[in-house]
């Protein structure tokens, strides 16, 4: 809101994201115990555009931000799996993501513009383009999971993950009312197959899946934590004559404070 109590409006859009290429290795150090590690190369580009204007006045301020991102991070983990009888197995794992860094090559342009009813922009004046380089931390993360099940019959398990900080601001995602805090998640789920080898009933060979999850995203908007929770249901539909499935999933959930 401006000094004369005129309400400003803002339009925002963005494009891009972060990609990952990875290489991993694992080794069984005991009959029931394995360890592994992988290295991830993260890369991508994110572009955002925002237009701030006063309604019914066909002029405003446009800001364009571009960030070219690249960097490495590492994961290490270990897994234990053992049979408690002829059919039932138990398993557990611990994974740790080592804190890494993303190097961001930033470009920022601020312009005065006019616009039409379709918000097509025409540049009137432009400030000097800003270019700089920043480093963004990829926070460390610890996750622990455990489960129990029978091969090709049923599995039930859960996972807990914790991260001290969910992220950092950069030019492309700066907002006055947005901050970042701790991340945490809890999930439970499993699957059930009535009869994997049934030749008489298709329904008995279907994989029935379900799960619950709760996630504290770490994103803070107007000092309110944004949480994500959901119920998931799914089916694995076997293709006759093959070892392949068609997987269908459904999710009912809530994200945010409303």
Feature annotation, model-predicted:
Residues 1-258:
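Outer-membrane beta-barrel porins/channels
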